Amino acid sequence: MSAFSALRVAALLSSLPAFALIFAPAHAQELRNGGKLLLTNGVSTIEGSGGGGLATWSTIAGNATQEGIGGSVHGTVIELPDYNWTSYGVALGFFDRVELSYARQNLDTIDIGTALGLGRGYTLNQDVFGAKLRLAGDVVYGDALMPQIAIGVQHKRSSDAAVVAAVGGGSPNGTDFYISATKLFLSQSVLANATVRFTKANQNGLLGFGSATADDHRPQFEGSLAYQFSRRFVVGGEYRTKPDNLAIAREDDWVDLFAAYALTRNVTVTAAYVDLGSIATADNQRGAFLSLQAAF
């Protein structure tokens, strides 16, 4: 990952709407009311919700406990052989019970855009609006075998309806539903997560939702396993299955190997090796992932 990529992450964070920045770290103490254990709020997914990088967890965004309001902002860059991905977003957590999130996703097609007839550097865009509700359990406390369980919804709106129609997508807009279970086993320093997502998204929704022959929500799995070397440093891996709806291009499952480090209580950096398989006729899309999160 180049220094230029790190600058791009910083630039993404600076481009967030002003309302996302009104909760400055200086006010974190009264909102946090003691706060969660370091890193137990997870980081920000590419869809803006709290979790890992690729997989959604049941964690609620921000450092606040059940007595406070918290949140986070993030910027993410993924550099692949034939594409560049950027996303940024904001999430708010209310009393460690409810999470509301927003993310903007951008996929720069670089030279592939010319091959697809879109023009070099054509960028696919999508907005993701999310809500999550914690139903039971706690990531850290309570019964050692009882995970934190949450349900969630993510409504996605592509900005490229003409492209979606051209590749055979059924609709430029769609909604995912999921249920997640997450637990940190403190004595073993191991975090485990399992999520079942009901979706018909093509390439996360950037190529629309469903097709003429596959227009039903189908369950997909998102799993994460991480080991905490210290209070500040975590390594792990994730696996996310994907639907394969489009006849024009194969869609593969996603895998990553990541490391997350808490620079401070409020700032976490995550780096990963990602394998996103085939994207819109371009195979072997493996590369580097870098994300910066600021949480309060």
Regions found by a protein language model. Name each.
Residues 1-14:
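Bacterial N-terminal signal peptides that target proteins for export
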Residues 207-296:
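Outer membrane beta-barrel transmembrane domains
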Residues 193-195:
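Transmembrane alpha-helix/helix-exit interface in multi-pass inner-membrane proteins
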Residues 28-190, 199-200, 230-233, 243-245, ...:
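Transmembrane beta-barrel domains of Gram-negative outer membranes and organellar outer membranes
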Residues 110, 203-209:
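Surface-exposed beta-strand-turn/loop segments characteristic
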Residues 19-28:
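Sec/Tat signal peptide C-region and signal peptidase I cleavage site
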